[in-house]
Amino acid sequence: MTTRTDAVKAYLLDLQDRICAALETEDGGTRFVEDAWTRPAGGGGRTRVIENGTVIEKGGVNFSHVFGSGLPPSASAHRPELAGRGFEALGVSLVIHPHNPHVPTSHANVRFFIAEKEGEEPVWWFGGGFDLTPYYGNEEDCIHWHRVAEKACAPFGPDVYPRYKAWCDTYFHIKHRHEPRGIGGLFFDDLNEWDFDTSFAFMRAIGDAYIDAYLPIVQRRKNDAFTARQREFQEFRRGRYVEFNLVYDRGTLFGLQSGGRTESILMSLPPQVRWAYDWKAEPGSEEARLTEYFLQDRDWLAQA
């Protein structure tokens, strides 16, 4: 490993530890179980899963560091000059599915790729972001989520938050449903326009911001009363989450195509989901308002 890779790996392992500790404290009912694994083709990771907690129905916080002699198609499709290069990929990826339908599902990911070829300069980039998927929308939560995102981006330039907010809205779009997965956040990939130190600092800022963005929402909503009907709607909307992850998500596709560990890759899927044929929300209901108001391209900071 290079010095750069060592530094990124040390940060990611520490980030995984800090996020797991914060989520365990907030849940208060159970702890993460760690499953350390190795990849026969090179590398390995630490998968940590929490299930049937007081607050969290299922969640996973995964660290992986994999390497190989050639990039899989999902990583080189839009960068054909990288075909045939050896690679290392490091990242932390997490998804939290709470019990309570009033608590949104959250996702975050930060990652580093480096691709090398003998006689040529290494090519590296960072990626990541975080996004929020509510089932029952709440303006206060949406504004808070985006304020934390904007604050994390601010030291790196005034255009960074709006650019990566827009990319998030575009990326987390379920094309066959013609709707977004959630209310967005930040998404960036192939980041190497700054020097390494600045790019790495930005990745750290995004990784560190996740807990500040998510925990206050959990704390506000985790004790809200909910009905069996609201729970059914949560499970119905989780189906959209599954559809996106299995059809479009780059991380899922990269993991499966590169021979990654299937259990770790699919830890993002919720434990209980339902599909109903041609289901429609009642006009004027909270369920209808989710898609009509919250799942729209919206400047949440302008709502404040």
From Swiss-Prot:
GO biological process: protoporphyrinogen IX biosynthetic process
Site location (Important for dimerization): H176
Residues that hold substrate according to the record: S93, N109, V110, R111, G259, G260, R261
Protein's pathway: Porphyrin-containing compound metabolism; protoporphyrin-IX biosynthesis; protoporphyrinogen-IX from coproporphyrinogen-III (O2 route): step 1/1
Binding-site list for a divalent metal cation: H97, H107, H146, H176
PROSITE patterns in alphabetical order: COPROGEN_OXIDASE (PS01021)
Compartments where found: Cytoplasm
Cofactor: a divalent metal cation
GO cellular component, one term: cytoplasm
Function recorded in the entry: Involved in the heme biosynthesis. Catalyzes the aerobic oxidative decarboxylation of propionate groups of rings A and B of coproporphyrinogen-III to yield the vinyl groups in protoporphyrinogen-IX.
Quaternary structure annotation from Swiss-Prot or TrEMBL: Homodimer.
Family as reported in the entry's similarity comment: Belongs to the aerobic coproporphyrinogen-III oxidase family.
Name this polypeptide is given: Oxygen-dependent coproporphyrinogen-III oxidase
Organism: Pseudomonas fluorescens (strain Pf0-1)
